[in-house]
Amino acid sequence: MWQFDFSEYETTSGGTWRVAGIADYWSKYEYPFHVSPTANQHDAIDAVELALADYAELFGHPMVDDCPVDEHTGQVLPVVTIVTDNGGPFRSFRFEAFIELHPELAHVRTRVKSPGQNGSRERGFGTLKYERLFIDEIDDAVMLAERAEDYRIEYNQVRPHEAIAWNRPKEVHLGMADPNIPNFQNQEILPTT
């Protein structure tokens, strides 16, 4: 399951930018952020395309190759459900048509006025802002995109996460670590005498 939403950030030069973020709920892996002056149906599609391209790069094949096929109908079944709120970009015909063209994806929207149903994504934006964006001045969209990407790399590859047993999201996402089994460095301390 992917959790997807938009967040806003105002730069020091006065521009307000929208950051689209998609995170894998199970592994906590953050896909690349899409930064734009708008948060419309085109931006939503661009963000999903970025995530699909990142998936293909990580796993060496497109996501659709992992889809099971219904043996009775021959229909390709989705392997990822994208969870969004009820914002305009996600209710648009164009976004729904895009999802329909990708049999590997399904889309559900949370209940109206229920941000907690997409709370992991909301919390992810809070962490991005407080750990990376609010600590110094960001002049423009280019700097915003650079800081967001720096955060994403650190978040996915460097720091361990309590929610996935102190493993790193990229390792869990690639199946190199179990999100239920801690991956601590065990240092054996032997007696010196």
Q: Each predicted region: which residue ranges?
A:
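Mobile-element integrase/transposase regions
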Residues: M1-A23, Y29, H42-L50, D54-D70, ...
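Acidic/histidine-rich, metal-coordinating catalytic segments
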Residues: V48, G60-R91, R111-P115, A165-P169
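RNase H-like polynucleotidyl transferase catalytic core
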Residues: T81-N86, E100-S120, I135-D140
